[in-house]
A protein has these predicted regions:
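Active-site-proximal, substrate-binding regions of enzyme catalytic domains
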Residues: 1-57, 82-216, 222-373
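Charged, flexible boundary elements
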Residues: 60-81
Length: 374
């Protein structure tokens, strides 16, 4: 008989590992999951492919609110859609975006000034899962609650989940429009054998197919943002910036606290993580670099942070190395023609002014360019 051991400090994790251990596929489980995670990080599959049915809510909570590094669509991808938004636009929430805005509301009191749409199918699904989770243990949900990144409803995790799901339903009713799409319901009947996640997404995306209204999808699935480029879609970040700009920086901070990758970064986040790095303490400067690699709109925040830090330091050795890496990351996604542009020339001219710290920053950007082109 194969033994298993219970760690008194991590009882739930021990039981979860035991279940996997006794599974006939246990020898391949971790390898298969790691392959899926690698594919997800490369953008080859959506996060939903990492979720084990029927624990859909718990699966998204683990992705969004642990140290997993969930990847959101980079905000700059939405800019061309923003110009199409008008007073008649209606915004449709996908499940991960709904959970993200709900938990941000729990931490900050945020309420959307424009009520987004939640499909009636998604609303009823969440109400069903509220009951489902009373009788079924969700290890991913437990992990998210214990992470410390989201508001706690109760010290008892089981009670917390029940209270949280009740609050989620109430938040939807208070802050969203619950809309039924009859055309989508008709389509859904023909897709009864599809997975829960597939049917939820099909129903949500069907709003965008209608000709009678100006619908915009709010989606934080990076993969979907790539395959639906012809459809109007924005990220939660853009939605908050457009209609609750007073909450925008707090939302960016919240996403960074939750290890969500790809969102824009504030100058303060970059400064704080650099100071931790310089002090030799625990820091997330590598995550800052990873986010900036694919989010060039954070370049201004990097520039401002580097000038702020360089202007107050005498010994700039660590800073020069760190910000050379940051600038190189922010240049990666740009066309190399950028370095021949007037914008680049203006940057170098500005950093040549005899202002304290500018010479250090100029050295960083020129080193970054040299490394990138070598």
């Amino acid at each position: 008989m194969m033994p298993f051991f219970i760690d008194e400090n991590n009882i739930l994790e021990s039981f979860e590992n035991a279940i996997k251990q006794f599974s006939p596929e246990s020898c391949n489980y971790e390898e298969q999951r790691q392959k899926k995670i690698d594919d997800y990080k490369k953008g080859n599959i959506p996060y939903s492919h990492l979720i084990e049915i029927p624990d859909v809510i718990g699966g998204y909570y683990k992705g969004l609110f642990t140290s997993f590094e969930y990847k959101v669509p980079f905000a700059y991808l939405s800019f061309d859609i923003v110009s199409q938004i008008n007073d008649n636009s209606r915004f449709v929430l996908e499940l991960p975006s709904l959970l993200l805005l709900f938990e941000f509301s729990n931490k900050s009191g945020y309420n959307p000034k424009i009520k987004p749409i939640v499909s009636n199918v998604l609303y009823e699904y969440i109400k069903y899962k509220k009951t489902f989770l009373i009788y079924h243990v969700s290890f991913p949900f437990y992990e998210a609650i214990r992470s410390g990144y989201i508001y706690r409803y109760s010290e008892d995790v089981s009670e917390d989940i029940q209270l949280r799901m009740h609050a989620l339903v109430a938040w939807i009713e208070a802050n969203c429009q619950i809309v039924s799409n009859e055309e989508a319901l008709a389509i859904e009947e023909t897709r009864a054998n599809d997975s829960e996640l597939s049917r939820l997404f099909q129903h949500t995306i069907s709003f965008l197919m209608r000709k009678d209204a100006n619908y915009v999808l709010i989606s934080d699935e990076t993969y979907y943002s790539r395959i639906t480029q012809s459809l109007p879609a924005i990220s939660s970040e853009i939605f908050v910036k457009l209609f609750n700009e007073d909450s925008y920086k707090a939302f960016l901070n919240f996403m960074f606290e939750c290890h969500i990758c790809g969102a824009s970064l504030t100058e303060q986040i970059i400064v704080d993580e650099y100071k931790k790095l310089e002090a030799g303490g625990e820091n997330r400067f590598t995550e800052v670099i990873d986010s900036i690699k694919s989010n060039p709109i954070s370049f201004q925040a990097v520039l401002s942070a580097s000038i702020s830090l360089a202007s107050e330091k005498e010994d700039t050795g660590i800073l020069t190395n760190a910000f050379t890496d940051l600038f190189e990351s922010s240049f990666v996604i740009l066309d190399h023609e950028f370095f021949k542009s007037q914008e680049w020339q203006n940057l170098i001219i500005t950093l040549s002014f005899p202002i304290k710290g500018y010479d250090v920053v100029k050295k960083c950007v020129e080193n970054a360019k040299r490394k990138l082109l070598s």
